[in-house]
Amino acid sequence: MAAPSAPTAEDWAFAGSYTNKNSKGYRYNWGQQVRSMMGTVVEGPDQGYVRFRIEIAPDGTLAKLETIWTTSAVAEQLARKAVENMPPLPPTPTGKPLIFEKTISFTPFASDGPPSYKDDCLPDPPVFRNPFAWDGKSPQVRSEPPKAEKLDPQAMEDCLRQLPRDSIEAEMARDRREMERWGWNK
C-alpha cells in the first residue's frame, strides 16, 4: 500500500491553532507526516506497528522521542528515520510543550483515519468510581457519583468557534473504528 499523503499547509495551519483535546489536530498531523515519509508497505515480515512517546517543544521542534513498543524493527527504523527528516513544524497550539503517545501503523491496510472533532466541546464524562467499594475497615458509606461539569457559555462559544467542519472521511473513519471495536463487521 502506498504511503498516505502528507498533511497540507492548510492542515498544519489548522493544527497549529486547534487547542482542544490536547491539540488533537496537531497530534494527528504529526502521525500522518511520519507515516507519509515511511514509504510504501507490502505485506510481509517488515510490516508492523510502533508506539512512541513524543515531546514537542513549544517552537515545534522535537524534544524527545521514546519507543514504548514495536512489532517490527523495520517499522521502528523507518519511523525514526522519518521523524529525523521531518520538515519544520509549526509551534504548538498552546505555546507549551506537547506530550503525547502515538501508534504508527506500517501495514498494507489503512488503520488510521482523520479524527472527528464534533464532540470536542462537550465536557469529559466523570470518571466512574464504584459507589459500593469498601476497604473492609471503615464504616460503609455509599458515595455519590460526581456530576458532569458544565462549560460556561463563553468557553463553549470559544470552543465551538475552533471546530472545523467534519469531513466525510472523518465520519467514515469513526464508523470503521466503532465497527472494529464492537465487531459489527463480522
Q: Which residues make up each language-model segment?
A:
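A sequence-level signature for low-complexity, intrinsically disordered linkers and tails enriched
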Residues: 1-6
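Acidic/histidine-rich, surface-exposed loop or edge segments in extracytoplasmic proteins
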Residues: 7-20, 61-64
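Short proline/glycine- and basic residue-enriched helix-capping loop/turn segments at helix->loop/beta transitions
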Residues: 20-52, 80-118, 122
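Short tight loops/turns at secondary-structure junctions
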Residues: 45-71, 83
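N-terminal targeting leaders
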Residues: 70, 74, 119, 123-128
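Terminal low-complexity, intrinsically disordered regions
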Residues: 126-186
